[in-house]
Design a protein with these regions (language model features):
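Bacterial N-terminal signal peptides that target proteins for export
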Residues: 2-14
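Cleavable N-terminal signal peptides
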Residues: 14-16, 25-26
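Electrostatic cytochrome c docking/interface patches
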Residues: 21-38, 121-149, 223-249
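Sequence context surrounding c-type heme c attachment/ligation sites in exported
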Residues: 27-43, 56, 72, 141-154, ...
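Short pre-active-site segment immediately N-terminal to redox-active cysteine/selenocysteine motifs
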Residues: 38-44, 49, 109, 149-155, ...
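Extracytoplasmic electron-transfer domains, predominantly the class I c-type cytochrome c fold
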Residues: 44, 49-113, 165-166, 172-220, ...
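His/Cys-centered metal/cofactor-coordination and adjacent catalytic loops
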Residues: 60, 120-132, 217-242, 256, ...
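Conserved N-terminal glycine/acidic-rich loop preference
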Residues: 123-133, 158-177
């Protein structure tokens, strides 16, 4: 074990000494100089090409897909020593537990390296636009937090909750994931982590794609205190909502439980407990759009209500949700 520790520490010192002793002319913003810098410093620990391999065969995380993986501002901060270690127990915790100090470069050099990654280390498997972080809702992020725990992500990755760090420290810390990762890359990673780090203890969860997207929404907000959540009830579909279309959808899907006139007396209602909501007794003009949207789109169980109320969003689409909301607000005004 002592020999292994010396190997890791020694390798890190070699990289650090190499960085400090390189001629100044290597630190430039052009690609040839960046490549030379990377070859002399980074590749002693990181791979920039090759097939995915187990972390137990590596010295540090692969940079094969670094141009797709990291947000540039975070990468610059990391390379200039302004970010905390990602692996509290060490990337190769089987050899030596504890974080390793990463070599630090100047901001100019960091930008040159980032330029090189963006040009030469893109991952062709990553679809640009596969995950739209601007469409993450507060509800989705909250649900993603529950899914994160339900699928055991918390066992290996730390996150921040109520101002405290929780979770295992065996793998990458995720409490600043929203600043670090390109979400298109993280989405592809989440579809099958084994494509990136096989035989490394990474878990392939039995999660649906909507659940994965919710988990990514949760992670997108980690480390971003001013994260701007999307409000779908302000989307274009709601600007052109039609009570007339909503009435048709209400008949097709809602009437079976809530009744033709919203009295909770649809054919399915007789044997249901709890009974369906009586829409005729509700002034939907007073119901907040956020609550009404989430109830229709995500279903009763998600809102702490009856699980007999389905999550209709996948069935009727966002325009359908908007139209039903318009119909409810135009039709039901509460008891007269």
């Amino acid at each position: 074990m002592n020999l292994r520790r010396r190997m890791i520490v020694g390798g890190s010192l070699v990289v650090l000494v190499g960085l400090m002793s390189m001629p100044k002319l290597l630190f430039g913003s052009d690609q040839p100089r960046a490549k030379e810098l990377i070859q002399q410093a980074c590749v002693s620990c990181h791979r920039l090409e090759g097939a995915a391999d187990s972390r137990f065969n590596l010295r540090a995380p692969d940079l094969i897909w670094a141009g797709s993986k990291y947000q540039r501002p975070w990468l610059i901060r990391w390379l200039t020593g302004k970010e905390a270690p990602l692996y509290v127990k060490g990337y190769r915790w089987d050899l030596s537990e504890g974080p390793m100090k990463h070599p630090v470069v100047t901001e100019a050099d960091a930008n040159a390296i980032a330029d090189y990654f963006e040009k030469n280390n893109k991952d062709p498997r990553v679809q640009v636009g596969a995950y739209d972080v601007t469409k993450v809702t507060k509800f989705e992020a909250a649900f993603g937090g529950m899914a994160y725990k339900a699928h055991a992500c918390l066992g290996c990755h730390t996150v921040e909750e109520n101002g405290k760090l929780i979770g295992g420290q065996q793998s990458a810390a995720l409490e600043r994931a929203g600043q670090r990762y390109n979400m298109d890359w993280l989405f592809r990673f989440g579809l099958n982590p084994q494509d990136f780090v096989p035989h490394s203890g990474e878990f392939l969860a039995d999660a649906t794609e909507p659940q994965l997207r919710a988990v990514l929404g949760y992670l997108a907000a980690q480390g971003v205190p001013d994260f701007k959540y999307y409000e779908p009830w302000t989307a274009p579909e709601f600007g052109k909502a039609s009570p007339g279309r909503g009435k048709v959808i209400y008949k097709e899907y809602c009437m079976q439980c809530h009744g033709a006139t919203g009295k909770g007396d649809g054919p399915a209602a007789a044997n249901l407990e709890p009974k369906p909501a009586i829409h005729a007794n509700i002034n939907f003009g007073d119901v907040p759009n956020e609550y009404l949207y989430n109830m229709i789109n995500h279903g009763g169980a998600a809102m702490g209500k009856s699980a007999n109320m389905p999550y209709w969003g996948l069935t009727i689409g966002q325009q359908g949700v908007a139209d039903v909301m318009a119909y409810l607000k135009a039709t039901f005004k509460g008891p007269k």
